[in-house]
Amino acid sequence: MRSTIIVAFLTAVLLGCGNAPARAVQQQEDLKQDWEVQPALWSPRAILIPHSAPADSAASDTVTLLDSLLTHSRAALSDSARGDSAKAGVKSATAAGRPKKRGLFNISPSDSALWPVKAPPPLPGSILPEHRIVAFYGNPLSKRMGILGELPPEEMLVRLEKVATEWAAADSGTKVLPALHLIATVAQGYPGPARKYRLQMPDSVIRRVAGWAEERGWLMFLDIQVGVSNVEDELKVLVPYLKYPHVQLALDPEFAMKDGKRPGTDWMGRMDASEVNHAIGVLARIVEEHQLPPKVLVVHRFTRNMLTNASQIRLDPRVQVIIDMDGWGTPGSKMGAYRWFVVRHPVQYTGFKLFYKNDKPMMTPQQVLELYPKPVYIQYQ
């Protein structure tokens, strides 16, 4: 009884009156009006270390960059706080690199032949494959959900730029774009007012993280854990945010519960290609209606059953789809999962997740770059 009262209190604090439909509709209308008068000034500011840069020079440049980051971050966060209170080029698809004959990761010729995937050519303004995205995952309201919330914002943002710079050095010549991957809809064991076993983040949290990304020229991902809700309903709430050019989308099948199961149990959730296709359709319409660059959609996966009928995912040039290998463990087990559940079920692009605490040991950028195809999306939790 006591735990129920505590959870209910926290829900009320986060969401005010809970998930009342009238409040959600009004919130979206206010948001829509706000965005309609704000020009889309965002443009990506990637990190690039040229092929020709000597190793010592690259390291020196990295140190100089990091020395200046803390001062910049403090000023930016101060400006953001005041604001809150006051109110392509196309890169060849083969650039992922053919698999090496020797190394940590070896795949068969038949698996290698699946890549690169036949897909619509990237449209102007596309993030992929010209960039590699390096993201910090989590939620600023929780220290247990990932590094995005585990560290103070100022420290977290500086650390993300440092990690992204390390990736740029490890794969010189490839642009690296940092990203903040926010769990915007959080699956939970408590049913909540809507009895959907999920908690929608309030506008203030989403806007805060979006502002951090926007002012730095980074990306932001809104991650949906639907609980016992569905992609269609949960996506409607986030559509206004997705009108920003730097805001992207992610789906987490692990917490898409079916057959009466609940989050937080031993049961694994799953999504079907039809649900992914719905998200692709929504994103494509947003891109078309608001004349935005193509969106990026990340779908987490670390078992075969998490994503059913993956071969039926319908690609659209306005949406670039990444299947992100989301499992933790030893390097060998992670590479095996990447081979079995991502490489052998090609969709379009690939991602790879790294866990600071659960990977034993955590793979280095150089080790991850041994994978084929090379992941274009790297996520840290």
Which role fits each region the language model picked out?
Residues 253-292:
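Substrate-binding surface in catalytic domains of secreted glycosidases
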Residues 7-14:
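Bacterial N-terminal signal peptides
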Residues 166, 175-254:
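Substrate-binding cleft of extracellular glycoside hydrolase catalytic domains
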Residues 139-141, 183-187, 225-227, 254-256, ...:
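Active-site beta-loop-alpha junctions enriched in small/polar residues
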Residues 203-206, 242-250, 273-277, 318-333:
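Acidic, His- and aromatic-enriched active-site or binding-groove loops in soluble protein domains
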Residues 18-199, 315-319, 332-381:
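Alpha/beta catalytic barrel-like cores
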Residues 1-4:
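Positively charged n-region of N-terminal signal peptides that target proteins for export
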Residues 226-231, 288-306:
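Aromatic-lined carbohydrate-recognition surfaces of secreted/lumenal glycan-active proteins
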